[in-house]
């Protein structure tokens, strides 16, 4: 069907798991954090500053999946959304209470690391690795 395009995933020869996190997982986490903050009615300008992206990037995150140019390579499973919301809450509080930028950045780093660790433990990052890279065994236990 013309309207139903299946996105072809170009597989690479090999990626280290950290590259998968940088190229695929972090952009998707930024997108989901931005959307959580939008639902909390934070201004786009503030969200962009918090996440270290441009305002047009936030606008892209709001588009439907197939229309996005940013953070569109992978989907974060729905059962992780409560954790995304929790991280967005902590980051928003740290931003508004911010005695210094360092305190906010430490909170953001801690929350993003917590989310990545949870995704890794649940095998989500392994699934993304298999989807985007040749030769990742189904029972790979390297991470």
Roles of regions detected by a PLM:
Residues 43-50:
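Short alpha-helical "recognition helix" segments of helix-turn-helix
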Residues 62-63:
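DNA major-groove recognition helix of helix-turn-helix
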């Amino acid at each position: 069907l013309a309207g139903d395009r299946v996105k072809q995933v170009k597989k690479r020869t090999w990626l280290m798991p950290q590259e998968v996190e940088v190229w695929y997982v972090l952009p998707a986490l930024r997108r989901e954090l931005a959307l959580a903050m939008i639902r909390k009615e934070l201004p786009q300008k503030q969200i962009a500053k918090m996440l270290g992206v441009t305002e047009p990037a936030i606008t892209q995150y709001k588009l439907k999946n197939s229309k996005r140019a940013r953070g569109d390579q992978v989907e974060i499973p729905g059962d992780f959304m409560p954790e995304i919301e929790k991280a967005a809450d902590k980051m928003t509080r740290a931003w508004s209470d911010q005695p210094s930028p360092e305190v906010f950045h430490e909170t953001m780093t801690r929350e993003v690391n917590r989310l990545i660790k949870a995704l890794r433990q649940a095998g989500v990052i392994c699934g993304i690795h298999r989807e985007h890279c040749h030769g990742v065994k189904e029972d790979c236990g390297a991470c």
